[in-house]
Amino acid sequence: MKTLAIETSCDDTSLAIVSEENGNFQVEDILAYSQIQEHQKFGGVVPELASRLHSEKIIAILQSLGLERIKEVDFISVTTEPGLPGSLVVGKTVASLLGEFYQKEVVPVYHIWGHVFSILLERNIQDLKLPMVILTASGGHNDIYLIEDQSAQTQKKSDFPQWEYAGFKITKL
């Protein structure tokens, strides 16, 4: 399985080719444009500037990654939420256009799950020791999650939000 991953949730424009075979996740290629210098003079991220810079840079990044490589991927994954609305629209629009042109499924990815499951990159999924606790620190979305096998029988109160995702049970603590 191979995906073109598109991330434009805030002030970095990132595209990657990520593959999985027999539980091994590999980043084949990643290119990114950081907007830090443009935003520093304002003392923080300016949403309108961020989305404009995504629009200006994403096609050049895609071309550097190699348009012909899109034919190799099984699907296109794109960050959906949370994030800056204008920035997210740029990524979703490019993903939708590429999906339509190359006849590839576009898979929305919840931004925070991207952080949580980045632990799988360059590893075999079988090497993960569950249960585990993960701290995410991403802008205003700083949380602690308990990750268990999806089949885990837990005694936890139901007042904690829970999700099942990619074969894992996730509890926000």
Question: What are these language model-derived features?
Answer:
Residues 1-173:
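Short acidic/glycine-rich loops and adjacent helix/strand connectors
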